[in-house]
Amino acid sequence: MKKFTLGLLALIGVVLLLAACGSNTAAPDSTNGGSDSAEEDLLAKVQEEGTLTIGTEGTYPPFTFHDETGKLTGFDVEIAEEVASRLGVEAEFLETQWDAMFAGLDAERFDMVANQVGINPERQESYEFSDPYITSTAVLVVPKDSEIQAFEDLEGKLSAQSLTSNYAETAKSFGAEIEGVEGFNQAIELLNSGRVDATVNDNLTVLDFLKQRPEANIEIVDEADDAAQSALLFRKGSGPMIEEVNKALAEMIEDGTYEEISNKWFGENVLE
């Protein structure tokens, strides 16, 4: 009996010792892990590697597209390149479809997204944004002579939209059915071919398209009352990185670099 008691006490001692060890090894995770660690890791990673990896479409003029030489360019591309330069690192772009952009950011394929990403409450629940660098409005685009002349006319009509965009939500809010597309260019193709009735998109994008293609058989027939703002997109827990990016954006606005880039692409300041 005495041997049994001693054995039991020894076993209890071992269990308590193991529990204490487990508690000690878990403690650092609760104090050093989580979002603070992620924040520090992203900024440190970018600085150590000397590269800021940026997700973008590359098919969305004038924000991100390929020019006649095949070079990736556009307003968002130049803004992101300037931000990277002011952080002392190189900008590296990874192109992907819009609807895969957020999954790519989640999977850490890139450090941020530069693709005129609109700020909305739903996205803010899952992601973090830099300070805004674009202010724009949604417009309704239809073939010339269409019976659709206002957003209210979208009830029961087919609208070509990127499925996860703010503009898809706008079209649905007016009763439109949605035809999913991979970007603005495909939406315009479907509109020109008569396969859809309309598309809702950014006024800056549509105006640029009409400037490049004045013969296009489409027109803007309505414009949303409220303006939307867009910003650079990050994973949750990127606080220090975003602070540095915001400093760079503020410096660009202060020294006139932002306005120079904006005037180049739009002929005006698109933040005001």
List where the protein language model places each region:
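C-terminal motif of bacterial Sec signal peptides marking the signal peptidase cleavage site
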Residues: 17-20
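Extended ligand-binding regions for polar small-molecule ligands
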Residues: 22, 77-78, 82-86, 165, ...
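Periplasmic-binding protein-like
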Residues: 135-142, 207-250, 268-272
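Extracytoplasmic small-molecule ligand-binding "clamshell" domains
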Residues: 33-114
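Acidic, polar ligand-binding/catalytic clefts
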Residues: 81, 85, 90-153
